[in-house]
């Protein structure tokens, strides 16, 4: 596919705007670029490569000449337009969760399973942001020994809830500073100076839908259908970049030295691990970056076959927009 026509569905949202930025940064070869959104955004201009692209309304006809469609819209919008996109012969790289677990839809992290993208039937799904960041960090270790299980706790930034998340955090901090009452709208409780241990809806055995994604999506991406994952997802008062504490268990023991070497050599990873010198991954450092930072690598004291680590990554870039553009690059 040479100089494909690219259409962004949901171009005015945070992920859609980041897709535009990343397409330009990576010099993605584009024939024609179209930006689609809802009717209320029609007529707005978005900047790309020194020019302005006018936003058009998303309709079935708007995909007629597309070769690649980058989806940055909600599930219902993705499902609404997927048939029209497929009918044109375009490839729909979708960031929503609408198709992730469909058997005939590849779920792809290019550093891990790029070959899966080549077996698509018109749709390729982008995994959940926390799934991408976690798996990029641990995938290098599976080359040393198969992963049998993982226990993870995510610390997810407020921007993961949309553009209103950082606005609400800032407003609450300002209100508290002035001694005024806090009125949450985006989150169920005050997020300023607080943690909220629920992201998503109630799902299975007391887990939330967000927590089950790491197991369900991880199994599919790693081709490990029996891998067991327990996850706790927490919203934290950080503006951007998610962090994950992971304990991974393997078929054989892996030394810390082996793990560090594997992660240092892994695509998409940056080893940041020198505890005595206070060097470790932090969300502030990974914001606006595409690499996943990995550190705090140490033995699991409860299981000789386990390793613990801490990873951070920008959930808007590598956790969403960059991963989608990388998938598109596989199709060129």
Where does each model-flagged region fall?
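Charged docking surfaces used in two-component/phosphorelay signaling
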Residues: 9, 69, 158-332
């Amino acid at each position: 596919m040479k100089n494909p026509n690219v259409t962004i569905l949901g171009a005015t949202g945070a992920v859609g705007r980041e897709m535009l930025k990343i397409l330009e940064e990576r010099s993605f070869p584009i024939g024609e670029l179209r930006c689609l959104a809802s009717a209320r955004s029609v007529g707005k201009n978005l900047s790309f490569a020194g020019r302005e692209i006018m936003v058009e309304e998303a309709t079935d006809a708007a995909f007629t000449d597309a070769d690649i469609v980058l989806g940055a819209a909600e599930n219902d919008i993705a499902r609404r337009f997927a048939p029209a996109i497929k009918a044109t012969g375009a490839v729909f790289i979708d960031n929503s969760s609408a198709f992730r677990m469909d058997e005939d839809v590849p779920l792809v992290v290019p550093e891990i399973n790029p070959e899966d993208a080549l077996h698509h039937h018109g749709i390729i799904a982008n995994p959940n942001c926390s799934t991408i960041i976690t798996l990029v960090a641990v995938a290098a270790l599976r080359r040393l020994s198969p992963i049998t299980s993982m226990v993870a706790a995510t610390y997810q930034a407020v921007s993961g809830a949309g553009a209103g998340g950082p606005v609400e955090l800032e407003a609450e901090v300002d209100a508290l500073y002035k001694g005024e009452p806090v009125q949450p709208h985006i989150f169920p409780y005050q997020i300023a100076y607080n943690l909220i241990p629920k992201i998503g809806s109630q799902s299975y055995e007391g887990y939330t839908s967000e927590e089950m994604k790491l197991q369900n999506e991880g199994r599919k991406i790693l081709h490990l259908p029996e891998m067991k994952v327990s996850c706790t997802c927490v919203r934290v008062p950080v503006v951007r970049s998610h962090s994950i504490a992971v304990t991974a268990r393997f078929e054989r023991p892996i030394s810390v030295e082996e793990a560090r070497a594997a992660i240092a050599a892994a695509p998409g990873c940056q080893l940041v691990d020198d505890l005595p010198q206070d060097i470790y991954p932090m969300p502030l450092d990974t914001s606006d970056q595409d690499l996943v930072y990995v550190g705090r690598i140490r033995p699991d004291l409860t299981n000789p076959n386990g390793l613990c680590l801490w990873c951070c990554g920008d959930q808007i870039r590598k956790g969403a927009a960059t991963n989608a553009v990388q998938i598109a690059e596989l199709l060129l």
